[in-house]
Design a protein with these regions (language model features):
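Helix-adjacent hinge/juxtasegments
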Residues: 54, 64-107, 112
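Amphipathic, non-transmembrane alpha-helical scaffold segments
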Residues: 10, 64, 68, 166-174
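Short, surface-exposed acidic-centric catalytic microdomains
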Residues: 28-70
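Donor/substrate-binding cores of folate-linked one-carbon enzymes
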Residues: 23, 28, 36, 89-187
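N-terminal Rossmann-like dinucleotide-binding module
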Residues: 1-41, 45
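Amphipathic, non-transmembrane alpha-helical secondary structure
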Residues: 18-22, 44, 69-76, 175-178, ...
Length: 187
């Protein structure tokens, strides 16, 4: 059985991209990294691993649909069947959603529906909750509102700092995302 060809979208450091690349026995090949930040460290990680990169600057386009159409063409040219968002800090628009309906997955550092959007760990910490978590979900037009695939909780300890909590959340992300990717691609 041939491996699925996937793309990973990331905007910053790419720790979840790295976790996907490091995971063993995934039934896929990461064919493309899509990034919207020209100086993101994830680009260097991809290049070091011989993963092709597609880097765009949204301000170079008149509309979201324009750059998303260019992304769709790049994905189709490479036979990409799934998209996995890994710290991609842009909302996915209709052009991508229609082209890859039911095939775009995101990982979010909270136990959704709590703390959607940016700085979810900081939001959870400031709210003083007893637990936060990690959610893997399908992407829809909303902000972290798509159907949930899997979630796991992360306790917030009384002596936690944002940094210690973030480390535990990231550790879970790096374990959970490859596990869910494997499950989805083996269906």
């Amino acid at each position: 059985m041939s491996k699925a060809k996937i793309a990973v979208f990331a905007s910053e450091t790419g720790s979840n991209f790295q976790a996907i690349m490091d995971a063993e026995n995934l039934p896929c090949e990461v064919k493309l990294l899509v990034c919207d930040q020209q100086n993101a460290t994830v680009i260097d990680k991809a290049r070091a691993l011989d993963v092709e990169t597609f880097v765009f600057h949204a301000k170079d386009y008149q509309a979201k649909a324009d750059y998303e159409q260019e992304i769709v063409e790049a994905l189709r040219d490479r036979g990409i069947s799934w998209i996995f968002l890994a710290g991609y800090m842009r909302m996915v628009g209709k052009t991508l959603l229609q082209a890859y309906e039911g095939k775009i997955i995101n990982i979010h550092p909270s136990f959704l529906p709590a703390f959607p959007g940016r700085d979810a760990i900081g939001q959870a910490f400031e709210a003083g909750v007893e637990a936060t978590g990690v959610t893997v979900h399908f992407v829809d037009e909303g902000m972290d509102t798509g159907p949930i695939i899997e979630q796991e909780a992360v306790p917030v300890f009384i002596d936690d700092t944002i940094e210690t909590l973030q480390k535990r959340v990231q550790k879970l992300e790096h374990r959970l995302y490859p596990k869910v990717i494997k499950q989805l691609l083996q269906k």
